[in-house]
C-alpha cells in the first residue's frame, strides 16, 4: 500500500502558499490555485512542528456547480455522529472546497467525497455519517493512490499516512490458499450468510479466531482471504 508522506521539501513553498490562501478565506484566482494544487500530491499532508506523531491533512474538492456543501466521509473520523467534523468550507465565489483535519501519523483508512445539492433537507445531511445515507459518495479524483472497492462498484479512496503499517498483504491480486466454507442461517427473521476461512497452515499450528462483521464486504469485495 502506497503511503502519503508529508509534502516534499521542493514543494513546501507551494503547499504553504495554498494553505495560507485557504486559511485566509478570501478570494483567490481559482485557475491559478488549481494549477498549483495539481502539481502536488493530494490530499495535502503537512508535518506539525510540535507533534511528530500527528499530521495535518488538507482535502480539496472542485465543484462543477453550486452546492449546499461537500462532506468528507473519512472512516472512523468523520462518520457516524461526527458529520460536522467532515464538512468542507468553500472559498468565496470559487469552485474550491477544502477541509483540514489533524490525524495520527499512523492513520490508514478509506474515504469518499459527498456533494450536497442545494435545498437538501437538514435531516438528509445529519444522516450522511450513517450506512443508510441517501447521498452517495465518490472517490477523491485528486488522490492518485489506488482506491478500494468496498460495496458493489463503488470505489473509495485510501489515505495511508507515513507512519501507517505498510500492509503489503493487501497489495496485488492473489488467490487464497486455504479453505473457505459458506453456510446460510436465519437470524432475527433474516437470512444471513456465514463464512468460515481456514488458512493453509499445518494442522498442529495453533490458530486464533477473528470474527468479522459485514462479511460480504470483507470477502466479496476486499478479498480478506488472500490477505
Regions found by a protein language model. Give the residues of each.
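Peripheral/terminal regions associated with large enzymatic or DNA-binding modules
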Residues: 167, 173-178, 182-202
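Short beta-strand element of the alpha/beta-hydrolase
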Residues: 194-198, 204-217
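Short beta-strand elements bearing conserved aromatic residues within extracellular beta-rich modules
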Residues: 70-72, 111, 194
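Short beta-strand segments enriched for Tyr within beta-sheet-rich domains
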Residues: 107-115, 207
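Non-catalytic, glycine-rich low-complexity segments
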Residues: 1-62, 169-172
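Residues within well-ordered beta-strands of beta-sheet-rich folds
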Residues: 100, 112, 195-197
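Aromatic-rich carbohydrate-binding modules that target alpha-glucans
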Residues: 52-106, 116-178
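Short amphipathic alpha-helix adjacent to the substrate-entry channel of hydrolases
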Residues: 219-227
Amino acid at each position: 500500500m502506497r503511503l502519503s508522506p508529508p509534502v516534499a521539501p521542493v514543494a513546501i513553498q507551494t503547499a504553504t502558499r495554498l494553505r495560507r490562501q485557504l486559511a485566509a478565506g478570501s478570494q483567490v484566482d481559482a485557475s491559478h490555485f488549481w494549477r498549483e494544487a495539481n502539481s502536488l500530491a493530494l490530499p495535502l499532508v503537512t508535518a506539525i512542528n510540535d507533534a511528530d506523531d500527528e499530521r495535518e491533512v488538507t482535502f480539496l474538492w472542485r465543484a462543477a456547480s453550486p452546492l449546499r456543501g461537500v462532506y468528507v466521509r473519512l472512516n472512523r473520523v468523520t462518520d457516524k455522529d461526527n458529520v460536522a467534523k467532515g464538512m468542507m468550507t468553500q472559498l468565496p465565489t470559487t469552485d474550491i472546497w477544502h477541509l483540514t483535519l489533524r490525524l495520527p501519523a499512523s492513520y490508514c483508512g478509506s474515504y469518499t467525497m459527498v456533494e450536497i445539492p442545494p435545498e437538501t433537507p437538514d435531516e438528509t445531511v445529519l444522516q450522511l455519517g450513517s450506512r443508510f445515507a441517501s447521498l452517495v459518495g465518490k472517490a477523491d479524483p485528486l488522490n492518485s493512490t489506488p482506491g478500494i472497492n468496498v460495496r458493489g462498484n463503488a470505489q473509495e479512496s485510501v489515505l495511508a499516512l507515513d507512519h501507517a503499517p505498510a500492509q503489503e498483504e493487501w497489495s496485488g491480486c492473489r488467490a487464497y490458499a486455504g479453505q473457505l466454507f459458506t453456510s446460510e442461517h436465519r437470524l432475527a427473521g433474516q437470512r444471513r450468510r456465514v463464512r468460515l476461512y481456514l488458512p493453509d497452515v499445518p494442522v498442529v499450528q495453533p490458530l486464533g479466531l477473528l470474527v468479522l462483521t459485514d462479511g460480504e464486504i470483507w470477502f466479496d469485495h476486499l478479498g480478506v482471504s488472500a490477505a
